[in-house]
Design a protein with these regions (language model features):
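Active-site helix-to-loop segments that bind/position phosphate- or nucleotide-bearing substrates
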Residues: 1-182
């Protein structure tokens, strides 16, 4: 009932309206956000000057510009931050992947934290995580081939949905837990 009431109440500001850092220079913005990753992902040439980058970021609501300088929006930081840890409000939104030995949480084999903005860190997270998933080895006529127990596309979609649909007002890390059987 409490969660349902919260959903119906709504009233949360859009991510592109919430500012996390204010009064920044263009150089400060480029220190905190990855312009190279943005333009690469959008299949656009990287502008030759900082002004072109800032104009594009403003048009995409990744940053805002006013008389005191630039402000990074929560949207901009969440997807293109070089380090989410640079933003107090997002420190607990880094993705944690924990691999356990066996079928319970008694023994951790390894833990990896992915600190980059979700858009720029997603590929490396997917790659690392898929390397941790249980797999079998199929022997064909001449070659051996790794066969994942779970299709990569399904896991990729689950993780993307976890990140996109999380409640950012809730405390806690987005977490992926991997066990020997799942």
């Amino acid at each position: 009932p409490a969660k349902e009431a919260k959903i119906w109440r709504g009233g949360q500001k859009a991510l592109e309206k919430i500012t996390l850092k204010k009064g920044l220079s263009s150089q400060d913005v480029l220190t905190l956000l990855s312009a190279e990753a943005y333009f690469d992902m959008m299949h656009l040439p990287l502008p030759q000057d900082t002004k072109g980058i800032m104009e594009r970021f403003v048009s995409e609501n990744l940053i805002l510009h006013d008389e005191v300088g630039y402000s990074i929006t929560e949207l901009g930081a969440l997807v293109f931050a070089k380090s989410l840890g640079d933003f107090d409000e997002l420190k607990r939104k880094v993705v944690r992947v924990i691999v356990y030995k066996g079928k319970n949480k008694l023994e951790t084999i390894r833990e990896q934290v992915f600190d980059k903005g979700y858009a720029i860190g997603f590929e490396s997270m997917v790659s690392w995580r898929n390397g941790q998933l249980p797999s079998d080895e199929e022997i064909g006529q001449a070659l051996r081939k790794d066969a994942r127990m779970y299709p990569e596309i399904a896991i990729r979609e689950l993780v993307a949905n976890m990140l996109i649909h999380q409640d950012l007002s809730e405390q806690g890390f987005p977490m992926i837990e991997i066990y020997s059987d799942r």
